[in-house]
Amino acid sequence: MKGNVIVGQSGGPTSAINSSLAGVYRTAIDRGAPKVYGMLHGIQGFLDEQYVDLSEHIRNDLDVELLKRTPAAYLGSCRYKLPEIHEDLEVYEKIFGILEKLEIESFIYIGGNDSMDTIKKLSDYAIVMGYPTRFIGCPKTIDNDLALTDHTPGYGSAAKYIGTSMKEIIRDSFCLEYSKGLVTIVEVMGRNAGWLTGASALAEGEDCEGPDMIYMPELSFDVVNFRDRVASLLEKKTSVVVAVSEGICTADGKYVCELGNSVDFVDAFGHKQLSGTAAYLANYIAG
């Protein structure tokens, strides 16, 4: 490796995101990269020329090991959506101007789907303009929904947390004196992918029967059928625990959380901020 490397972190930090950073840094150094830069606060910070020489901060093997176990995102993060090339050419010219100044051979971005969108746009521009820089996406998402990736770094720890939390909730529901007729609906992250909600099944074991029902966004949701199934379970059990993805939709494609209130806020990538699915369902079966 003759040229320099730059690496950034983007999106929500996972417990493994700094391990990926440590791996990128160590591999780049081992392959002979003269310098390994870290962009501060992702591509948004890079546009303001905020970056550091990582060798000044990661000085030995102990620092690498400590970085692996450091929480949050060591370099800082962002949720900045790159415009399309035809929408704002100046943004791309600025980015590639900085890359040329730093003599960057490889640009590595640690993140999920939106971060891969950034990598694709930069790669497309480089191909069109004939730049030799390589743009590489390093997978990171608790949603486990990156194409061609079996288990994304970040998913395992999130799945373990959900399974453990669900087991505690289920055990609590059976030890409460007033639990007869109690229905607990646990809303889990997952707009379009149900991997996290599915992980609630990890609660099942010798000491726990697991959630009674699990609803994921890959299948359409029927609120009437849900109410009837809860009622049927309560005829056999003193309490019911259900796991639902925040992004479950009815057959016509409407988010269940929007049945009660409209969702107005969207992020930089146009994603609606979903919340209230469990609250709506709780009110529905109670009413």
Regions found by a protein language model. Give the residues of each.
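Short, hydrophobic/aliphatic alpha-helical segments
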Residues: 1-8, 97-100, 283, 287
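N-terminal phosphate-binding or glycine-rich loops at protein starts, especially the Walker A/P-loop
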Residues: 1-52
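Gly-rich Lys/Arg/Thr-decorated short loops/hinges at beta-loop-alpha junctions or inter-strand turns
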Residues: 2-7, 67-81, 140-150, 180-182, ...
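Short glycine-rich or small-residue beta-strand-to-loop segments that form or flank ligand, phosphate
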Residues: 4-14, 73-79, 105-111, 183-188, ...
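Cofactor-binding loop segments of dinucleotide-utilizing enzymes, especially the Rossmann-like FAD-
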Residues: 10, 41, 112, 138-140, ...
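Short glycine/serine/threonine-rich phosphate/pyrophosphate-binding segments
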Residues: 14-24, 46-47, 83, 90-93, ...
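Accessory alpha-helical/coil subdomains and C-terminal extensions
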Residues: 36, 98, 106-111, 117-132, ...
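Glycine-rich oxoanion-binding loops at beta->alpha junctions
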Residues: 49-105, 114, 142, 153, ...
